[in-house]
């Protein structure tokens, strides 16, 4: 209304906009509303949260992060201020799978059968392999993910995609979690997982092997989802001069951000570590 006053009579503007002249003058004397006065501070808080969460959170998860830092604000307001500030999440891209199931090794039955829920930690693990480009060539990354906590419990990286790399990731997961016998281990039908050495290792640890159907990425969807998240939030936005640089940054992403800080909707907006901690606290209290 202030912008149109030089060109139009005040009385006419008030009639068109449905306000009284006295009401207009009263609003001017009151000054900016408390809500309007909050905007600059909220913009700073939202921008800080966007950076703190590595530009990966949408409005709902951003709201949870802000609440955790003592800032209460509605989702719709966050959406509006994000648009105003030009803040956007990192975007996903498509990437190719690494599985080569063209071999004559024995294959396990699909025991998991897309039942992506687990009642307790160390009940079901998922595993898969992906690759990361560096100036030195490909870096292959193996991961093991707990289906209950969504935590990456084991991982290993190297310049070759071998059964030994997969075995190293499994050993790390076992050393960290000490799972009970009977754990369900699900993977694709890649030759690394079907190798005699790896199958023997699973048997020695008392784990039951389960494998996806041929060419069906949905059979291992939570693990595929982690790779997509890693690539969207880190890999696609970085240039790695060496494999060692990539190893350092991927390790930091998994250990510091993904496992301990990154909120997940399916975990009641907790991080994997916080969800796991809550599980054991509730179990002790029961």
Regions found by a protein language model. Give the residues of each.
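Charged DNA-binding/catalytic regions of mobile-element recombinases
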Residues: 1-286
């Amino acid at each position: 209304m202030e912008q149109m006053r030089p060109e139009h009579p005040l009385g006419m503007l008030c009639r068109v906009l449905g306000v009284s002249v006295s009401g207009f003058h009263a609003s001017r004397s009151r000054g900016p509303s408390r809500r309007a006065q909050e905007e600059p501070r909220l913009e700073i808080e939202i921008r800080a949260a966007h950076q703190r969460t590595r530009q990966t959170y949408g409005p709902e998860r951003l709201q949870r992060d802000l609440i955790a830092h003592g800032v209460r604000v509605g989702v719709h307001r966050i959406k509006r201020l994000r648009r105003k500030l030009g803040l956007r999440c990192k975007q996903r891209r498509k990437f190719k799978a690494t599985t080569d199931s063209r071999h004559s090794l024995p294959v396990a039955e699909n025991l998991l059968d897309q039942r992506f829920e687990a009642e307790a930690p160390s009940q079901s693990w998922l595993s898969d392999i992906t690759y990361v480009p560096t100036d030195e060539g490909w870096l292959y990354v193996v991961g093991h993910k707990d289906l209950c906590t969504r935590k990456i419990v084991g991982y290993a990286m190297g310049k070759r995609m071998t059964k030994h790399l997969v075995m190293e990731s499994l050993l790390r997961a076992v050393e960290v979690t000490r799972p009970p016998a009977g754990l369900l281990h699900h993977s694709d039908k890649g030759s690394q997982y079907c190798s005699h050495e790896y199958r023997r290792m699973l048997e020695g640890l008392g784990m039951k092997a389960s494998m996806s159907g041929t060419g069906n990425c949905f059979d291992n969807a939570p693990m595929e989802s982690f790779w997509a998240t890693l690539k969207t939030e880190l890999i696609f936005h970085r240039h790695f001069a060496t494999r060692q640089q990539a190893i350092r940054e991927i390790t930091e992403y998994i250990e510091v951000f993904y496992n301990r800080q990154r909120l997940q909707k399916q975990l009641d907006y907790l991080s994997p570590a916080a969800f796991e901690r809550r599980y054991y606290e509730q179990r002790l209290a029961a």
